Amino acid sequence: MESSEEDDEYPFIESITPQSKIDSVHQSLTEKGIRKLCCELMDLKDAVENMCGDMRTKYLAFLRISEEAVEMEHELVELRKHISSQGILVQDLMAGVCREMDDWNRLPGDVHDAEVEEDPLPNEVTDPKSEFLEKIDLLLAEHKVDEALEAMDAEERSSPDLKGSVEMSSYKSAFMERKAVLEDQLLRIAKQPSICVAELKHALIGLIRLGKGPSAHQLLLKFYATSLRRRIEAFLPSCLTCPNTFPATLSKLVFSNISVATKESAAMFGDDDNPAYSNKVVQWAEREVEYLVRLVKENASPSETASALRAASICLQDCLNYCKVLEPQGLFLSKLFLVLFRPYVEEVLELNFRRARRVIFDLNETDEGLESPSDFVTILSEFAIASDTMMTDCSIRFMQIVQDILEQLTHLVVLHFGESVLTRILQLYDKYIDFLIKALPGHSDEDGLPELQDNTVLARAETDSEQLALLGAAFTILDELLPRSLVKVWKLQIENGGGEGENSAALNSSAAPELKEWKRHMVQAFDKLRNYFCLQFVLSFIYSREGLTRLDALIYLTETPDDLHLPSLPFQALFSKLQQLAIIAGDVLLGKEKLQKILLARLTETVIIWLSNEQEFWSAFEDESNPLQPSGLQQLILDMNFTVEIARFAGYPFKVVQNHASVVINRAINIFSERGINPQSSLPKTEWFTEAAKSAINRLLMGSEDASEPEEYECEEEEEDDHHIVLPEMDDDSDSEDTSSLSTVDSFESFASASMADLESPSFTDSES
């Protein structure tokens, strides 16, 4: 009962196929498939072997038939010789038989008739023209072209029928036919692909003797063109293994072939006496140069790689040198080569500088081919301590990629494409400057700066040290590293910069005027970064975080003068911030005193320029509802003189600052005069403002209100240091700028290291305290 229930519960168990049976079935099917496949492969192998055997048999049969054909040709030649000799024997036999028969049949009474009767057969047999033609036929049949040519030349010189006959006689026609056969044989010899140079020259000389000079000249040029193609086809597979040097080998093959062909043409055809041949050689050489340029383009590395630039440079250098060597032979190919090759070089330069932009501005981009010169890394890494390392990497990449591009250039590339290279370096540096400006605080899309194509965003340089490090890196590239690299390429003399250390290199602009113009534009590009930094620094000083201005006209309308004659609080703050910045600059820009003075002088200048252009500031003075006091004008003039004295005291180029301050003072005097205040009667003398400004600087440095007015320094006029970089707006005054007697490094350091109670939150001296 239980078993029946189990059978009812599992009725399908008997229909299950065991796994072993499944495995055996699949195994048998797999074995059958493999056996079938092996059989098919064996059949295919047998078929291939049979086909190879048939091909081998047919090839051997073909070779045997070819040999038999050659032997048959020789037998035919021998048979033709034999027939010719037998023909001569038959003619001799016939002549002898005719004479004997004539003797036998001659009777005594028929003497007169025999003398009158003409026998045409002996004349026909002894005709020299027929003998000559038969001789030529025999020589042509035996392919003895030299003997045939000599015989035909001799006959043509001696036979009057060939030399002076105007009408075409039968003999002359037969002679010209055989001459055409000889020409055809010489052409076939010259057109053989495996012919050597000696055999070719021999055949061409024969054609020239036959009066076929143009055909011979064409065959000569065709031979050298064909041999060049074969040599290049054998060389091209190795281009991938030597991408930098293959253009040099190609140019050597092409131009050496042109030179040999030109010499052979002149020797065989006398190109100097026949301009038609020389013109043909020039046209042929131009086609070969076009072929060379096309080969270089087709087989070069990708145009954006440094190896492509190196290959193009070597090719241009070698080709122009070869063109110069060919000029004594009457071939002037330099201009043609430059016209053909210039677009390719420009393309390679453009794509390499595009690669440079990717490597510099896309910090995720890597270029394993770039080396890391220790001098670049060491010099620029000094700024990594004070700034973000990503920004320093950007500067290092800039110099690495530019140096890598410059190292690929040869002397003649610099000569013909130097201006283009300088322009692209300028554009790259300008992009680099825009890239750094994006890292400065205050940058926005409304600043009028061109957007970079990449989306890489640097971390903001928030602190003064980080911002100064950016400026220092950009200035070092401009003033030291780029000139040093260009000097090596342009092969100019290096001039030490005097106050900038032994490693400072300047370009000898008198030797390369384009470098002088390029340097001027590079300085202008750097000025964008410098001016943007100065503007943001001044704006952060003038405006509070709430957007309120600290430098307001109310300080000249409401505040009362004090007995200490100190500058207003905003200008005391300016003095403090400049002290603080000078200390930071002394650490970050160590050894870059030139840049420090440029920046700090520009900062003082920017403050006055902003004040001069701030219409809201001047509107407060022009508003008649605001009462004006002479003390306000006196305080404003004192602040301007104080700003000028800051620059003079620290040794900055202060002449431009003084000019801008004069503009502000004159404008203020005019406004106050229009409002009824007489400056002549209400203001002290000019010397008073100068002394008061000097005294204020001393008081602020000493940090004491009770300090007497010490005569710490007196101004002396001396020429500005000639070794300093003079900005474009300072060129007119560079030779006559006045600096303080403290315009030395010591005085600058004393200014930078002046004791401050708290540089972060300085305490200003208020006249009301």
From Swiss-Prot:
Ranges of biased composition (kind: Acidic residues): 706-721, 729-738
InterPro entries in the record: Cullin_repeat-like_dom_sf (IPR016159), Exo84 (IPR033961)
GO biological process, one term: exocytosis
Assigned keywords, A-Z: Exocytosis, Transport
Region annotation Disordered: where it falls in the sequence: 705-747
Domain of life: Eukaryota
SUPFAM superfamilies named among the record's database cross-references: Cullin repeat-like
GO cellular component: exocyst
Function per UniProt: Component of the exocyst complex involved in the docking of exocytic vesicles with fusion sites on the plasma membrane during regulated or polarized secretion. Involved in polarized cell growth and organ morphogenesis. During cytokinesis, involved in cell plate initiation, cell plate maturation and formation of new primary cell wall.
Assembly and interaction partners: The exocyst complex is composed of SEC3, SEC5, SEC6, SEC8, SEC10, EXO70A1 and EXO84.
Protein family membership: Belongs to the EXO84 family.
Name of the protein in its database record: Exocyst complex component EXO84C
Annotated organism of origin: Arabidopsis thaliana (Mouse-ear cress)
Gene name, Swiss-Prot/TrEMBL: EXO84C
